[in-house]
Amino acid sequence: MNTRISFLATLIFGILIVSYSIAGAEDGETLFKSKCGQCHKNGGEAPVFSPVKFASSQWERFFKREKHKRKKDISGIIPSDEQASIKQYLIDHAADSDLPIAAGLQ
């Protein structure tokens, strides 16, 4: 009986973690399109790009060095928690990732 309960608890916990990871990725994608897409679009004030523009280590460096601030400070536009979701989305789908996404903003 205890073995079954432990197994079910572990299974449910695993499903919740996977669901949370998938939801986080979707949030990052949605934020990338809605927030970054305000400027990074065809005819926009910034160039169009996709997650595969850089390798994951390059995205890490981009955010660590706050390179976006050189052109425009986005801290007043995109809160830090949303920036973290966007960063994770870009890293998860970078050129060297297991799930690269070439579709960019339009």
Q: Where in the sequence are the language-model features?
A:
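Inter-heme linker and motif-flanking segments adjacent to c-type heme-binding CXXCH motifs
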Residues: 45-48, 97-99
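The canonical Cys-X-X-Cys-His
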Residues: 33-43, 86
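Electrostatic cytochrome c docking/interface patches
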Residues: 14-31
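N-terminal, post-signal-peptide region of Sec/Tat-exported proteins
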Residues: 46-81
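C-terminal capping alpha-helices of c-type cytochrome domains
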Residues: 76-106
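Bacterial N-terminal signal peptides that target proteins for export
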Residues: 1-9
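Non-transmembrane alpha-helical segments in soluble domains
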Residues: 33, 60-63, 87, 91
